[in-house]
Amino acid sequence: MIVRSQNHHESIPVSRILRTKVEQKDHGNWLVTATVEPDRAIVLARYPNENEALTADTLMWLCEEDFYYFPVSVEKR
């Protein structure tokens, strides 16, 4: 499966992702980041709340399609 970041700047095979992390940063936004090498992390998506970020991260790991696109937030900013 290929994972596409929310802004479509990154496309990586899920097999290269060592782990993902959801953390609050970036002016209160919640970031979903993927570690693809021991010293390289990629921001996959930004969400206004932790729930959306955790849901998107979980859905990526459960996806059985050829591609996973991180959804845009449904919450108004």
Put a short name on every predicted segment.
Residues M1-R77:
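Eukaryotic intrinsically disordered, low-complexity regulatory linkers and tails enriched in Ser/Thr/Pro
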